[in-house]
Structures are given as C-alpha cells and as structure tokens.
Amino acid sequence: MPGLKVAVVMGGPGAEREVSIESGTSVMRALATLGYEGRSLDFDGRFIEALREISPDVVFNALHGVGGEDGTIQGVLEWMGIPYTGSGIAACAVALDKHLTKKLLAAEGLPTPAWDVFDLTGGTLPLLPGSLNLPRVVKPRASGSSAGVVIVRSHEAWSKTILEAAERTPEILAEEFVAGREFSCAVLGEEALPIVEIVPSDEFYSYDAKYKPGGSRHLVPAPIDHDLTSRLQTLALSVHRLLGLRDYSRTDFIVSKEGRPTVLEINALPGMTATSLLPDEALQAGLSYEALVDRLVHYALARGTETGVLSP
C-alpha cells in the first residue's frame, strides 16, 4: 500500500522509555523498507497536537508500560478515531495489572504462581509475613519488561527491596518462586507462534537480560517435545482470549523439572527491539521483521476506527 502514512508512537514518560524508543526505531526502519511513510512522535504533552499535524492513516503503538499498555493511549486514539495496532483499552488495562490478571487466570484454572499484594503507600512499609516462604519474586503491580523485578531470598533482602520499591510504585506483588526452564509463546492474529526457550545469563529473565546484548540466548524452536509445545501454545492462546487481547501478545512461562507449565507474565504489547522475543518467533514461523510489522499495520487498518468522535 504505497503512500501509507504510519505514525510510530514511542518513548513516553515511564521507566521503559529507552526500550520503547528502541522498538519504535526498529519499526521505523521496517516501514521505510516497506515503502510506507513513517513518522515518529513521542507520547508527551504535545502528542494530540502533533498527531493532528501528521494526520496518519494508522498509528503503530511502540510504547511500553504505563501510558502505552494500560489503555491510556488506546483511549486517546479511539477518541480521535485513528486506527492503531495492538489490543484495546480494557484488554491493555487488565493485562498490565498483574494482580487482576492473576485473579482472572486463577478463576479460569490456568496455572499461575501463588501471590500476595502489598500496599506501599501507608507510611509503614510491610514486614515479611511469617506465612510467606522464601524465596519470593517481588514485582510492581503494574509494569512491564521485568522492570523492578527482584528475587528475594532473605528477610534482609525483603526490607531493602521494599524500601527501594516504595520509591517507584504504590503496590507490589510477592509471588511464589518457581524453579525451572523459561519459555515464551507469542500469539499473532489467532495463531500461536513457535515456542522460544529463554536462557538468561542472570538468574532470571530480568530487564537487563531482555535488552542488553548477550543478556540471554533465545532457542527457537525450543528444544522440547511436541506434547509440551502443544500445551504451551494452547495456554498462550487461552490467556490471549481470556484477556480479550488482539493482533498480538506474548505469554512467558516457567516449566518445572516435573514438566508442569506455569504462566509468569502476559505482554499485551511485546517488544520489537533487536533482542526481543516476538521477532525471533515470527521469523521461525516464516515472517521477516518487515513482514511482521506489515501484518500488524494491516490488522489495524482492517479493523478501522473504534469510536472516533474527533477527527485528527
């Protein structure tokens, strides 16, 4: 579709700004290769004005975390009547809220680690309850890219982690630690892509392991049997549908030594950087990076605008 004008939204004010810019820059290069007119813009105070000036045919949402994955930008774009890539308002808001997502998974009988939620806004930081066995995985209630995720193995580490977390987030989850191999499965459209095994250089798939060169190895297709492949793909599709996600998503798993898969994280807007998992999985399925970007753009165009009460 020569002449198609695509606005790529990247950056934003959150902790995942740099990763978002990496994703958006990669998408911009792909759009140029495809012959589309790519226009980049930041999600800042001039966003609506800049979007009106660009007047794009479609928006490619390359934001991550708060503002980009929580329904905020989705609401703005629907208000303006501009088609955009990825999931809608409600699905994004639910998927970024780890507590709400886990409640839905548990209600549907889908495997997720046991967890507790702690409020850090009361002035008195919570002590480690005696009922919680260590280690625990502490993470912000609403964040992506493994930002702020820490494995707590001692009471001393708990106190330090809580103090640091209170400076960044109002609530945390403390999840049961599950040992095992890490896997990920993306959904594109209504199809589960090949499984990738993640072999992090650190003790888990941390922010650095995700985005720093050499931080992890991606084995795709994962060296697992057909039965486990099928179970992980089925789980990824179940999670995608349960949360009402669309276009694409990525679900991360841990598989215990007994072979039991557990859902760790759901990503409504998977990263599109050079070290991201989704492009690796798509390539194994026969889609180049450019073809993946093209597919996502055309999903949005085919869907069109949602409510559209204001013209850009």
Regions inferred by a protein language model and the residue ranges of each:
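A short small-residue
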Residues: 3-9, 212-222, 277
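Phosphate-binding site of ATP-dependent enzymes
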Residues: 153-234, 255-262
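ATP-binding N-terminal substructure of ATP-dependent carboxylate-amine bond-forming enzymes
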Residues: 1-96, 100-103, 107, 119-128, ...
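Active-site nucleotide/adenylate-binding loops and adjacent lid/helix of ATP-dependent enzymes
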Residues: 1-10, 38, 51-53, 94-181
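ATP-dependent carboxylate activation and anion-phosphoryl transfer catalytic cores
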Residues: 4, 107-109, 225-312
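Short, flexible, mixed-charge acidic loops at enzyme active sites
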Residues: 73-78, 204-212, 268
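A glycine- and small-aliphatic-rich helix-loop capping segment at beta-alpha/alpha-beta transitions
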Residues: 75-84, 154-159, 284-285
